Structures are given as C-alpha cells and as structure tokens.
Amino acid sequence: MKTPHILMMAAGTGGHVFPALAVSEELTKRGAMIHWLGTPNGMENGLVAPTGYPFHAIEMQGLRGKGIGRLLKMPVTLLSATMAVIKIIRGNNIDIVVGFGGYVSAPGGIAARLTKTPLIIHEQNAIAGMSNRYLAKMATKVLQAFENTFGNSQLDAKLETVGNPVRNAITGVAEPIARYDINDCSALKLLVVGGSLGAQVLNETVPKALALIESPFEVRHQCGRNNEAATQAAYDEQDLSMHKFTVQPFIDDMAAAYNWADIIVCRAGALTVTEIQNVGIAAIFVPLPSAVDDHQTANARTLTLHKAAILLPQNELTPKRLSEELAALDRPACLEMAKKGHALANRQACQHVANIIWQAL
C-alpha cells in the first residue's frame, strides 16, 4: 500500500482542532501523510505547527451573525476557497478528505465532491453545525460524537456514532475510584475553567460564591489570557481566609489538572464535556448562552440526563446558587457523579475514527 495522503480540515476552536490532532497522530503511526487545511490567522496555526504536518491556509470566514456585508460576499469567497482546495487536493495527491469542523470545512467538502475524493466528516457537538449539516448530504461517511445529533433517517446508511477523539494524556488519567478517597476529609479541590479565553461570568461569580461557603475549598482557577489581574482582584476582595486559591491565565497540562480536581466548574464545549466523561470528574456546567443553536446546553445534557453532572444555566448563575451547589457536594457524592460520567465515555473513539478513515482509503 502506498503512503496515503489525508487532508484534515479543522479550524477556529480547540473543540475542532484537538480531536483532529488526536486522530492525525493515530493515522501517522499507521504510516499516513497528514496535510492540514486551516485559515491564515486561526488558532490551528500554533497547534499544528509542532507536528510538522504541511499546513495549507485558505481565506474563509464564518457567516452566521456577521451581517449582510459578509453574506453578500460569501458566494465569491466560497468559490475562491473551493478552487484553492481543489488545487491542494490535486497538487498533493490527496486520497481522502476528513472534516472536523470550522469555516474551512465547507469549501473543503465541496472540493472533495468536485474532485471525487472520499469525504468523511465528524461532528463533535450534540447539535450539528451548519457546515456539517450541509456536507452530510455529500459525505462518504458521517460520524457523530453523540446519538441523534443529525436526526436524519436519510443518513442512516452512512451515519455512525463514534464519540469524540481525545488525546492520550486524557485517556491515561486514573479512573475515579482510584482518585477519589471517600474517607479523605480535607478541602475539596475545585477546578474552574472558562476555556482558553476564560469566562468573565465565572471569574466574577466564583470568588463571591466561595465567600458564602462554610467548608474549605482548594481552588485552581483558569481565568483566560489578559484576565489574571482582574480575577485575582475579585478573589482578594472577598474574605476567603479558609480557602486556598490559585489564579492563572491558562492551564497547559489539563490531564494533570483533571487528575488533581474533585469538582470542575466550566463551560460545556464538546471537547470539555468529552474529556470530563473520559476522566470521570464531578462537574457543574455553565453553558455559553451565545453558542450557536445553544449547542453547549445540548452537550451538557448528555451527562446531566444521567445525573453525571449538574447543569447551571448562566441566567441562573448567582453567587448564592453556585455556593449552594458546591456546598451540597462531598467526596462520596463527587465519586458517584464521576463514575456515572466515566461509564458513558467512549475511550476508543480515536482508534475507532482512525479505523473508519483507514478502511475508506
């Protein structure tokens, strides 16, 4: 078998890029040559660069909520981007195109169709994005992380639920039963994560909630870049003498952070929800209310419906409410929640997706 050349499409957010990177690593081990399709200034540039994969940048932007001007320009932008991807496919002898989402997926998928190159798409969220809903009709294979994401019986013949691929470091974290000591009476360890950019509402609310709790917590708070001083000030303004807390702009080693924590308060992006499932950790989800189609709430419900997490909508998030949710948890309760989430995880998702791609070559 000649070396297969695979074009991975993932751009815009870590929720698209990290699963694609995990699968790319697995495919590289099997002898594939990975090419990456992204945008010139997207976060994928920095994430893909260390891998050494050839990076192909095209000009493409999002459409929803961007105004009439961008809408009018979209046909020309899409045509130009599609032609650029056709050149990439033909110029690099691409054998298969795999889309994990982001603005580049639409022109990439159309280019695959026009060049008669097999196309596989993967949807990470519980509600499919606009590009993937469109591309599903022309894809060779449609993969979804959660059941009923597409909800279209016409896709049944090519639709498969596979979970979300995550990095080996995450799947390597010890199981909940090995991490939670129900006889440990020390302070619960609280991890607060608002995504790579942070979440202002969490930065402001968590310190006030802790001030209302009578039992001690040890807190590690990722506040987002450029938010460290303001978040530190929010903690310093409260009487938190019984608590220990650390504020940092970004956590590089999330596997270690998950391993440390008893409870996490966070948004509900697909990657975050999947990692929490894989690790098995008690979670309070505060979905981003502005997320397209409210997909973060749908993501969170894949756990909360099984009592494997707590859903706290942002419009209900107050210091008092958050303090009540946190105060009601102890290690035995955290362990039960963590075990339920862990039981729902698909820890072979990366290998499963890689197998499907390999078989389609």
From Swiss-Prot:
Membrane topology of this protein: Peripheral membrane protein
Subcellular location: Cell inner membrane
Keywords of the record: Cell cycle, Cell division, Cell inner membrane, Cell membrane, Cell shape, Cell wall biogenesis/degradation, Glycosyltransferase, Membrane, Peptidoglycan synthesis, Transferase
Domain of life: Bacteria
Catalyzed reactions per annotation: di-trans,octa-cis-undecaprenyl diphospho-N-acetyl-alpha-D-muramoyl-L-alanyl-D-glutamyl-meso-2,6-diaminopimeloyl-D-alanyl-D-alanine + UDP-N-acetyl-alpha-D-glucosamine = di-trans,octa-cis-undecaprenyl diphospho-[N-acetyl-alpha-D-glucosaminyl-(1->4)]-N-acetyl-alpha-D-muramoyl-L-alanyl-D-glutamyl-meso-2,6-diaminopimeloyl-D-alanyl-D-alanine + UDP + H(+)
Residues the record lists as binding UDP-N-acetyl-alpha-D-glucosamine: T13, G14, G15, N125, R167, S196, I251, A270, L271, T272, V273, T274, E275, Q296
MF terms in GO: UDP-N-acetyl-D-glucosamine:N-acetylmuramoyl-L-alanyl-D-glutamyl-meso-2,6-diaminopimelyl-D-alanyl-D-alanine-diphosphoundecaprenol 4-beta-N-acetylglucosaminlytransferase activity; undecaprenyldiphospho-muramoylpentapeptide beta-N-acetylglucosaminyltransferase activity
EC number: 2.4.1.227
CDD domains recorded: GT28_MurG
This protein's GO CC annotations: plasma membrane
rRNA-binding listed as a keyword: no
The keyword Cell membrane is assigned to this record: yes
Entries under SUPFAM superfamilies matching the protein: UDP-Glycosyltransferase/glycogen phosphorylase
Pathway: Cell wall biogenesis; peptidoglycan biosynthesis
Pfam families according to UniProt: Glyco_tran_28_C (PF04101), Glyco_transf_28 (PF03033)
GO BP of this protein: carbohydrate metabolic process; cell division; cell wall organization; lipid glycosylation; peptidoglycan biosynthetic process; regulation of cell shape
Family, as annotated: Belongs to the glycosyltransferase 28 family. MurG subfamily.
Function summary: Cell wall formation. Catalyzes the transfer of a GlcNAc subunit on undecaprenyl-pyrophosphoryl-MurNAc-pentapeptide (lipid intermediate I) to form undecaprenyl-pyrophosphoryl-MurNAc-(pentapeptide)GlcNAc (lipid intermediate II).
NCBIfam families referenced in this protein's UniProt entry, alphabetically: murG
Name assigned to this protein: UDP-N-acetylglucosamine--N-acetylmuramyl-(pentapeptide) pyrophosphoryl-undecaprenol N-acetylglucosamine transferase
